[in-house]
Amino acid sequence: MPFCLLDVDKDIPEREQHIYIKDSKEPKGHCKQRCNTNTIPGSMTERGCAFAGVKGVITGAIKDVLHVVHSPVGCTAYGNGTTKRYPTRPEMPDGSVFPVENFNLKHIVGTDLTESDVVFGGMNKLKKVIREASKEFPFVNAIYVYATCTTGLIGDDLDAVCKEMQAELGKDVVAFNAPGFAGPTQSKGHHVGNYTIFEKLVGTKEPPKTTDYDINLIGEYNIDGDYWVLEKYFEDMGINVLSKFTGDATHGELCWMHKAKLSLVRCQRSATYVAKLIEEKYGVPYLKVDFFGPEYCAENLRAVGKYFGKEIEAEAVIKKEMEKIQPELDFYKSKLQGKKIWISAGGPKSWHLSKPIEQYLGMDVVALSGLFEHEDGYEKMQERAKDGTIIIDDPNTLEMEEVVEKYQPEIVLGGIKEKYFFHKLGVPSVMIHSYENGPYIGFEGFVNMARDIYTAIYNPAWKLMEFEEEEPGDSNE
Amino acid sequence: MPFCLLDVDKDIPEREQHIYIKDSKEPKGHCKQRCNTNTIPGSMTERGCAFAGVKGVITGAIKDVLHVVHSPVGCTAYGNGTTKRYPTRPEMPDGSVFPVENFNLKHIVGTDLTESDVVFGGMNKLKKVIREASKEFPFVNAIYVYATCTTGLIGDDLDAVCKEMQAELGKDVVAFNAPGFAGPTQSKGHHVGNYTIFEKLVGTKEPPKTTDYDINLIGEYNIDGDYWVLEKYFEDMGINVLSKFTGDATHGELCWMHKAKLSLVRCQRSATYVAKLIEEKYGVPYLKVDFFGPEYCAENLRAVGKYFGKEIEAEAVIKKEMEKIQPELDFYKSKLQGKKIWISAGGPKSWHLSKPIEQYLGMDVVALSGLFEHEDGYEKMQERAKDGTIIIDDPNTLEMEEVVEKYQPEIVLGGIKEKYFFHKLGVPSVMIHSYENGPYIGFEGFVNMARDIYTAIYNPAWKLMEFEEEEPGDSNE
Amino acid sequence: MSELNVIKKERTAVINPIVTCQPLGAMYAVSGIERGMPLVHGSQGCSTFVRYGFARHFREPADIAVTSLHEDAAVFGGRKNLISGLGNLAARFKPDVMGVVTTCSSEIIGDDVAGFIKTAKVEIAKKMGEEAANKIKIVQINTPSFVEHQFKGYDNAIKAIVDTLAEPKDEENGKLNIIPGIVNPGDIREIKHMLSLMGVEGILLTDTSDPFDSPLRPSKADKNPYYQKGGTPLADLQDCANSLGTISLANYANSAPASLEKKYNMPSKVSEAPIGIQNTDSFIRTVKKFTGNDVTDEILDERGIVIDAMADVASRYLFGRKVAIYGDPSITVGMARFVAELGMIPKVVCTGVKNEYFVNDLKKVAKESDEDIDALFGQDLRALDVYLKENPVDLMIGSSDGRLMAKDLGIPLYRVGYPVYDRVGYQRRPIIGYNGALNLVDGITNTILDKYYETQDWKLQQ
Amino acid sequence: MSELNVIKKERTAVINPIVTCQPLGAMYAVSGIERGMPLVHGSQGCSTFVRYGFARHFREPADIAVTSLHEDAAVFGGRKNLISGLGNLAARFKPDVMGVVTTCSSEIIGDDVAGFIKTAKVEIAKKMGEEAANKIKIVQINTPSFVEHQFKGYDNAIKAIVDTLAEPKDEENGKLNIIPGIVNPGDIREIKHMLSLMGVEGILLTDTSDPFDSPLRPSKADKNPYYQKGGTPLADLQDCANSLGTISLANYANSAPASLEKKYNMPSKVSEAPIGIQNTDSFIRTVKKFTGNDVTDEILDERGIVIDAMADVASRYLFGRKVAIYGDPSITVGMARFVAELGMIPKVVCTGVKNEYFVNDLKKVAKESDEDIDALFGQDLRALDVYLKENPVDLMIGSSDGRLMAKDLGIPLYRVGYPVYDRVGYQRRPIIGYNGALNLVDGITNTILDKYYETQDWKLQQ
């Protein structure tokens, strides 16, 4: 029986289907693990909402758009600054410079809905706010407008408002209809983001110039500078990133994604949709890529190189970068060999990272989990796990406590909400959603992650955790 | 009877002669107040030692010399950084730039005398240290060497050592023989500093260029930027400060003081000696000047202007500066009118400031005192005081407590050692030796001082000093 | 001079808000109950954003459950979610108190929360047995997100807790109820410290100090489930009906005191945060008045040490410097009064709320300090940003949400309030009371020295 | 790895010293006695420079008298000065204890200090009456400036105080003697706090916490003459012969413990400053051992809060960063051990003393931390400056005397030790004990964030 009902779940036995223990004797090597379903109420999930999925993950990384959240003040407040760490540079594709650096981290607009808006509808207020916002930040290249629970429930028609305002303001005004309650997780928001951008933006603008080596880099959000790492590799290979979706991107880039020669899909959970749609409509093929860990990174650079006939350049990059990191990799492996790890990312990172962490750091992956991963993702986790590894969809805090007890991970890669909880159990935790001292992607990023894992495990605090009643022998006596 | 025996002095009745209460019915208008005598042991004086007088006051302000203190480590440690605030700029008179900014605040050298040096003498060690120091800071233009109590008592001949080292190193090496126990106060150190500089340095170098309007500015140490204020006025008048003694000065400037057309003596306690000697030997006349307070500042700029036929320029400076400060002066006067003040400077500032503080700030000077002032200074204090003012030579802490009780000053201008003592008695105190937010000289400096007095008196802490058992009427009830 | 110039928002839009919605305040309040568990009746974002925020600020876990409303609830209502949510939480966590926190969704849907809670109680009793079920208290807290802000949510929560749980007895307990407001663990510890110096036992309504700043001691921790240490015990909450009086230290938290006063004839006092000397003095006097206990020399010595620090540094380094203060309506007003006590000028005070107590409290500060104060009222950080571009100040005081603005404006920021996530330890350092004032004197002065004195470093020689 | 590389001074010259001479340590020690008055037998500079230094650091008055030796004393000896100095001080200040602190001059002149004190006692008795005179104790403290440094002076002073004043009784007093070393008021308060959490009463030898951090309360102050509040009462000093044991928290202060051990068969322990977790643990264990009292949960919870902070921030922000530490031989060694506990590398530790305990304590740190440490031994700030130009580090930890050097090197400075005059409040914030460690974690982390994270400010978003 590959499924597992944890002791803490005896009152919510539905959870059994979400928790799988890898057993390679399974006929198909994997097993349909339940996922992407609604969380059981009251079970202390780590999941977020659809609004977080679209604004927090997809659109919040764009440098030159203004976000208008149609909501009571709370959603706007929570949408500000982004919960991830998405830096942007002010440089624009046409060589100009956007007037505010990290604009995406600095400003957000909301309609501040109150009781009477709830009663009488908020569409007029929304229009007014969009006008004001446009006046306040006239230099933005587009305005994105977000539905929330409140406006979803009162039934405001955001598309109609945005259409009207786009005509009035002469710049793109785009509605994202992903109210918080939509879908079981933030993944619904990713989905809405993808479709909206495809339907309303892709194909509507032309790039200032194109080359034969233009790519879309899709699902790369520049968390803590991830994109800037990859950018260097592509530059070295002579490949031009025409459009990012959406890390350090401009609004314009989204509009001319149809002009690339190839799409690369980096985060396959949040962004495959848009790549597929672009392929279907515009014939731009896409590759699913993985740049986490030296081997995947090398493999995928090779694949891209091959596609563009840049095999030599790819090899050169790989060689150069590997040489740089090898000594550090060796050091961290010597320190981390055999240490038990639980990777609890949002989704894909749990399977991106499991092999590289085993291979390059010698660590023992004892548990994997995802917050909003879908079936294909769990298949990959299952495939990549060794026998006995526990794989959990949407783990709740009580389950986490039990897993720590039973599997005794020596480190957990997780989110900030769980981090301090694990600490209280005496287990170090490194933030895998937005990193500690990232970036974590690419060759050097993997070393950064290794270092963060290393420092977390070797933090002397863990050894000093409990007061010793007896003076240690080699002490100051 | 103009002298006064305070209640706290009943056990040390000698103090009566040091404390005078102004009485204009005195035949001569003033009275020979005892001063510049040894402090009574155990009476908690605020005075320092002769070493502090020479290094801390006179020589520590020079930008390009290295100081070697021939002492156990303590004197060297205390001599570091200077107790006053003497900034220097790296610009040199010949247009070059000294390699270290504020060098005078950053480095000091000592011979670190130990028991065996005390027994066998420290002269060889001193030589070794001077050699090392010269090697460590080869760019300095001179090395000044200081006797201290220890070396004074063991009888090391510093002049001999310096003579030898000067020959060996090819740069000026000058001994200052002012061991801590010499003389009743730091004033002895000033004296030694003056004579030594005159005898060993003045007349030994020639300036890179001279003009018809060259002056020596003597006794101006650039406390918190004082000199830089005066420098502007002289520049505006077309007068060239050929040598400072010693604020922001170079060693070279001291050596060519004989080439000025006129010496101005700013601090008349610490530096008149050298001006007199220069006049006697080289015929450079000197003027005693006072730039504290608008009126004295104006008067003395006029006197200098007159000397050089620059009356018009002087008037222009005075007019410009007065216009700038008048509104602020008016404001502070409105706030400080009638407030009782005790001016307890080292010496001259007590008489420099008493009149301007009365005239421009409308304050009531109730007490004056000096730490190391001589007879001529007390004469001036007596002359400038109104009837009933208490004038104290070398006040000790118990006397201070009694004066606070009896004269109820609302502010004391004093030193940092006394400052916090006065605070504990509920009386604000502003540091007059090295200032709070200076400079205090010149027109704008006087406004700075007025502001510091104003903020000290109006610090809301004084009103909040005692807890009120009853809720005030207009409060938050 | 000494005018309060109230500047209201002219925009309809809110840009870079400095308030958030009601539920956060309620989640904060319930987190201060020992084995207390907030259950947010809404979408997952409603709890997750707040847990994220608490984790980031306190660097501690924040256990907040959610009923995970989805499309089906939007159509059919949240009955099933709330009842099963309460049931699951009760069975798995065995909390002492569950606080049901509504949101925009559950309020718009129009769920009969009271009815659902009743049903849930029955089901819990069925499952866990009557006795076990009775030990678990459920507090209904209505916090519609589209009305006011987190401060109102806090006020609603404290009132709901008190109204639901208080159990009057015949005798007074000799204690004092204290409503601390949305403050930091360090502040609550300082309140308790002051009470202990006055020989007074307090009932904190509620006490987040330990839950949001807990020792890392796995060997001693509550496990299966893990609970953070501390919080106000249920027994104390029940006992709050029998106290000598109620003091609210947040000007927005006045409903529970009023309710206690009305029901149990208990004296109460509501003020802005006791930040600075006069506000703390006033708090101490109220404690004395309600308890009859004397003001001890020990506490006055602590006061004297702040006064000493103020005498030593305020006039020398701080006087006349202009300050912009933003955030919480109670803390900002307290801070404004205190910076005036330091001789600084609280040039502009910005809050996101629109309640009159903010204006009234600030008028008093303007009068006392003899300075004109601009009050950005019901405003946002963008308004402050625009204001400061025209009217620069020497120092900003507020949360980390103003950090990038401060950096762009070139104005140093002293961090106060919630959230502070870009530096560490601020949650532990009180700003309340005499010791809080001492921290502020040191922190503000050092910020000024860093920025304005290091350029002329010789000035720092003494 | 884990080698201690001892680098001794090659120069004869001392350049920018980080130690000063013995009398300072003695003046500090006597200042910690209630109504205790140091009388420096030397030139005026000997007391004035120190009073200046104390005023600048503590921002408090420091009452230190001097015998004002001048030329005549150099020739005829300081007899008159010392006898009249003691007489005047006794008559005018009515102190409980006068500590006669010698200097280079009085030692070189060869004054018979013991004899002069005897004579002075007779004269005081004549003047004030036998009874009043007997109440005033005189302690002779020999502190020749040309031998060692202020730490030796402190050690000599504590020993002299104990040897002169201790009065054995038949029964133990159940207390613990604590020699804190030259530390700050905040440190001593933290020591007392820890003892109180352990239910132990301490006799501080001596207690400068109140004298160097006194409330400003004119209405309650001792006047005519004004005395700062607090200090160890004479009765406690006399009672120190009857304690359960003596703990010295400064590795250089070992003479008094040895003397007490020898005379009264009292157990003692001498360690480096209890900075950081292991050193504080060790202190707590010693308290337990000497008193038999249990280690309470309260103190372990405070410990757990530091551990929590370290778990949260050390690996994330501090790990692997190189640190230069300079100053006091006991504090630097404690700091080195603590920064290693934070995962940082105590790359270089610089002190001005030449005592072996410094080297031995550091060897232990090197071994534990598995890092090479360079020990600048018997060195000065210039040596550190030259070293750091070749071997840059990420952080400097030490007194304000390194501030201009740090600025020129572009290395941030976290201020610790004596003196700190260019920022405020450091004298009140402990570095000792668990709460001291907590302050250090916060302070060091914020310094690192300021310098190395603000340039990539998005990293501070969570």
From Swiss-Prot, chains A, B:
Its cofactor is [8Fe-7S] cluster; [7Fe-Mo-9S-C-homocitryl] cluster. SUPFAM superfamilies: Helical backbone' metal receptor. It comes from the Archaea. GO terms for molecular function: ATP binding; iron-sulfur cluster binding; metal ion binding; nitrogenase activity. Binds 1 [8Fe-7S] cluster per heterodimer. Binds 1 [7Fe-Mo-9S-C-homocitryl] cluster per subunit. GO terms for biological process: nitrogen fixation. Its EC number is 1.18.6.1. It catalyses: N2 + 8 reduced [2Fe-2S]-[ferredoxin] + 16 ATP + 16 H2O = H2 + 8 oxidized [2Fe-2S]-[ferredoxin] + 2 NH4(+) + 16 ADP + 16 phosphate + 6 H(+). InterPro entries: Nase/OxRdtase_comp1 (IPR000510), Nase_asu (IPR005974), Nase_comp1_asu (IPR010143), Nase_comp1_CS (IPR000318). It holds the Pfam family Oxidored_nitro. [8Fe-7S] cluster binds at residues 49, 75, 149. This molybdenum-iron protein is part of the nitrogenase complex that catalyzes the key enzymatic reactions in nitrogen fixation. This is Nitrogenase molybdenum-iron protein alpha chain.
UniProtKB/Swiss-Prot annotation, chains C, D:
Keywords: ATP-binding, Iron, Iron-sulfur, Metal-binding, Nitrogen fixation, Nucleotide-binding, Oxidoreductase. It comes from the Archaea. Binds 1 [8Fe-7S] cluster per heterodimer. It holds the Pfam family Oxidored_nitro. It is an enzyme of class 1 (oxidoreductase). Its cofactor is [8Fe-7S] cluster. Its EC number is 1.18.6.1. The gene is nifK. GO terms for molecular function: ATP binding; iron-sulfur cluster binding; metal ion binding; nitrogenase activity. This is Nitrogenase molybdenum-iron protein beta chain. This molybdenum-iron protein is part of the nitrogenase complex that catalyzes the key enzymatic reactions in nitrogen fixation. Belongs to the NifD/NifK/NifE/NifN family. One of its GO terms (biological process) is nitrogen fixation. It catalyses: N2 + 8 reduced [2Fe-2S]-[ferredoxin] + 16 ATP + 16 H2O = H2 + 8 oxidized [2Fe-2S]-[ferredoxin] + 2 NH4(+) + 16 ADP + 16 phosphate + 6 H(+). InterPro entries: ChlB/BchB/BchZ (IPR050152), Nase/OxRdtase_comp1 (IPR000510), Nase_comp1_CS (IPR000318). [8Fe-7S] cluster binds at residues 21, 46, 104, 145.
